[in-house]
Amino acid sequence: MPRLALRQYNFYYRVNGEKAEELLKEYGEDGDFLLRYSESNPQNFSISVRVAEDKILHIKVTKYESDMLSIFEDERTTPNQFGSITELAEFYMEFPEKLREKNGLFLELKKPVYVPYHLEACAEEQRRTQLYRWWHGNLPASSANKLLQTEKNGTYLLRASQHIPGALVISAKTEGQVVHLTIYQDPSTGRFNIDGDRTKFQSAWLLIDSYSKNPIVEKGEASRVLYLEEPLFNTFIEADLFVDRFEIIRRPINPRESMEKTGISEEFDRLSQEALPAEQYLSKREGRRPVNAEKNRYKNIVPFDHTRVILTDRPNTPGSDYINASYVRFENSQRTKNVTFACEKSFIATQGCLETTISDFWSMVWQENSRVIVMPTMENERKEKCARYWPAEVNKPEVHGDISLTCTIERKVQRAVSDEVKAELEQEKTNRIAKGLVPEAELNGDGISYILRTLVMKKGKDTREIRQLQYLTWPDHGCPLHPYAVLNFLEDVDREYDYFNAQPIAASLPQGPIVVHCSAGIGRTGTVLVLDALLNQVKKVGLLCPMDVYKMVKYVRTYRSGLVQTEQQYQFLYKALAFYLKNNNPYPVKSFIDGDTDAFDFPRRLRPTPNASRPSSARQVTSSRPSSSASSRTSHSRPRTGPQAEPIFERSTSSTSSSSTLLKSTKK
């Protein structure tokens, strides 16, 4: 499993040594660790690591005059020095042989201990910040610079300091440059302040809110004005906070203007806008060739050339190797350098069969050695969605090309529904009916969730077994009322997939991709495979699993255009994941927001007014130099220089209701 990314809010805690031992014994496993400030010297740090169930070791981390960090006290003889505590911890996680106890035994740092914020105040304090949509986690300064350079002046984000545990950084664009303001957290009180400003705030939100109403002014000849106007939203969230994030982004952004515009719709709109330019550079030539036109159910939905499934063992005639199907791979490679998958898996996303493509479909299944087929559609929903490509009767074989196919078992599956889910389902039905939306498939259905078929394929002397799972209650328009049945369905899909992986033949003939299709092969198909992939990440990693629905959908669309076709399907992904995480959390679920999402919305923005006057009084704060040099310190042993001279900024303290609070526009 890929190493967990270290993130400031899940490995640093504002605790003493005694509390650190308590946390590691209660919640940790051998090799788990946390970082804290040293009690004897506030300039230094300590890494507390659990060695055994009843043994906790504390490793002293010394900060030299050069600002470099090391576990060795003598700066002149130490072999490894680090520019940040994050680099230090990552180094010893990657190279455990470099760290030994006094008795000579290796001391292994495996992963940061997970402390549930539901139960521990020190964890709640650190985790609360992550709920902000403008929080960008462990983003380095160089990446913040890259993100903000293309944004307008006044755009800002909040991130974790790479060098100071517990500290945050405001990265903001002003006059075409990016500046970084460090927000320090007092280790004794937990309050926040910007360097140079004596005002301390109880939370990062209150600090940002204050500075968004009062601009920051550079002290000196340049006199640049820094406005915190427009937050740059991030879509990343960790699994244990996903439920609260869903509650925040499902609400209207501005109810007075529109009840339809939510954080989710905003994400989906941005996703659609970003997809259009990218697709101009990806070829779909093969699917658009006249010879292949009749093989496409919808003429405008064809695969990319670089990810299409190419049928082999075909005659050398134009179009003979074509099928409207695309690979979608959740695998770690150079292609996925910005995405890490803890659970690697592959799919084939394809359209519902036409009568003329059934033979091609089964040739593909055989060629790829796919053993599981997922069909989230009926054959007909007002019109044909998919031609029946499996035998109509049990134990009566059909022949498609050189493949003989027999359905040996057909079983209807119905899952029991809890009273809680029934109540939620009835409420959702009532809400939709009130809006004139009648979910016929679920409202009037017979309660059958899906059909499981066992199919036997024969080609020559070879025989293979296939499982097909056909989901029956996905409504023709929209999405299921409740994710409960879909989640159970996907559990059974994974069970069948694991069954085939466990067979002895899998060692010599590995199981191929799961085949998923609806009608067009993009809407329900995309929703199912993205949901399955994200659920498997959570099951593998746990509550610290990074969740990013936006980036996952963006990623799969590089394999097949339009996967997750509608905003409703995109919202259903959030809804299903939130339901799963809420009902599979081993700790008591505690909401940060308690229905008050405004507390986690971005602060009111200060709009610059032309020709406004400079305030008479201001507070001084400091910012780092607006360049990426400070963020490039990645070597583990190369010497580093001390901090550079930093420009001074002022903060206006006048009332925001008066134009005099706004500073004069600076000369270019």
Curated annotation (Swiss-Prot):
Keyword Hydrolase on entry: yes
GO cellular component terms, semicolon-separated: cytoplasm; cytoplasmic vesicle
Chain segments carrying region Disordered: 603-668
Reactions mediated catalytically: O-phospho-L-tyrosyl-[protein] + H2O = L-tyrosyl-[protein] + phosphate
Keywords: Cytoplasm, Differentiation, Hydrolase, Oogenesis, Protein phosphatase, Repeat, SH2 domain
Tissue: Expressed in embryonic cells, developing vulva, body wall muscles, head neurons and gonadal sheath cells.
GO molecular function: non-membrane spanning protein tyrosine phosphatase activity; phosphotyrosine residue binding
Protein name as it appears in the record: Tyrosine-protein phosphatase non-receptor type ptp-2
Record-level GO BP terms: cell differentiation; MAPK cascade; mitotic cell cycle; muscle organ development; nematode larval development; oogenesis; positive regulation of epidermal growth factor receptor signaling pathway; positive regulation of Ras protein signal transduction
Function field: Involved in embryonic and larval development. Plays a role in oogenesis by regulating mpk-1 phosphorylation and oocyte maturation in response to major sperm protein (MSP). During the formation of neuromuscular junctions at the larval stage, negatively regulates membrane protrusion from body wall muscles probably downstream of receptor egl-15. Plays a role in fluid homeostasis probably downstream of receptor egl-15 and adapter soc-1. Promotes vulva induction and negatively regulates fertility probably downstream of receptor let-23.
Domain named Tyrosine-protein phosphatase: residues: 264-580
Phenotype seen when the gene is deleted: RNAi-mediated knockdown causes an increase in ectopic formation of membrane extensions from body wall muscles and a reduction in life span caused by early stage mortality. Prevents constitutive dauer formation in a daf-2 e1370 mutant background.
Localization (cell): Cytoplasm
InterPro entries: Non-rcpt_Tyr_Phosphatase, Prot-tyrosine_phosphatase-like, PTP_cat, SH2, SH2_dom_sf, Tyr_Pase_AS, Tyr_Pase_cat, Tyr_Pase_dom
Skewed-composition ranges (Low complexity): 616-634, 652-668
Organism: Caenorhabditis elegans
CDD domains: SH2_N-SH2_SHP_like
The protein's Enzyme Commission number: 3.1.3.48
Similarity annotation: Belongs to the protein-tyrosine phosphatase family. Non-receptor class 2 subfamily.
